[in-house]
Amino acid sequence: MADDLQRKGMELRTQLFGEKAAKAGHEYLRGFDEDFANFLNEQVFGAIWTRPGLPTKTRSFITMAALMALGRGPELKIHMRGALNLGISRDEIKELIIHLSQYSGVPTAVEAIRVLGEVTEPRK
């Protein structure tokens, strides 16, 4: 079961972040602790992200909303790139930021706007 979750987790991470970034992210965490890296890959990406109840794009929106509300800019940047890779548009992310600004506050929205600019500028 763990091997299957590892495989599913890496497939999902590759879909989100691309092969190079998925492998680099996993290796970075393995440098910290191999068990922790494997646990995150299995549980977060292999078990939770691949559950049948929600589409991957919806899970991506939920993740971005949580990271924005928590003020986690570096992780938000990673997941905004993933969202764009899934086909979520810049305008859809913009609407998420506007909507969430009323629940998490203007400062978190301004930070998310900055992050979105960093992510989408090179794509123009």
Question: What kind of region is each of these model predictions?
Answer:
Residues S101-A109:
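C-terminal structural segments of small proteins and small subunits
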Residues A66-R72, S104-G105:
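Short alpha-helix boundary/capping elements
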